[in-house]
């Protein structure tokens, strides 16, 4: 094993995702409520609003949506209303149905590359950790998905009372793991919530760009977790210096 000791992961859209997909579930629920919404419609609305999610999240008026159930409901219901507005739909019953569906453990599955990647890293001697902005029921979902036991450290914002990008959540993870920042990697799908705050904490970040949204990102980028072992090895060979040239994993 290299100078890297532990690899932390984000959860949503990194390890797990709505199953079969967010647009498919969204369209299915809308259709069940009598609305003519196709998967293509839902996909297009998601694509259009995705770059503005940080701003939309601020518009909800909920500062920490994962801490309390009522705040979670307010936060996500606001976002679902915004998505529906793009489709010309106003239906509070549908908003409630969407919130119920996407708050149900059975609506989620692991990406196909997750277990091979986690087991491969374990076999190489790396410890595994989790740092996620999620309600406390993520803990139960990790057990249901049979990966909870793989993480030596699990930092879930709804349990700990601190959310990304607050640097304290990264320091908490390092403290729990007994790890040094320069010996840690964090993998996530968001530049703002994963890459930038992890780097600010001294952790080596890896951006997981499954949909090819961040081709010009100036850092370590992978398109799937099958590329992660190579990226971690490359990062381990770099000096701990912010001036180090960026790495792009092969195949990304």
Regions from the PLM with identified roles:
Residues 1-7, 40, 89-95, 115, ...:
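Asp-based, Mg2+/Mn2+-dependent phosphohydrolase catalytic module
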Residues 2-115, 124:
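N-terminal helical cap/lid subdomain that shapes the substrate entry/recognition surface
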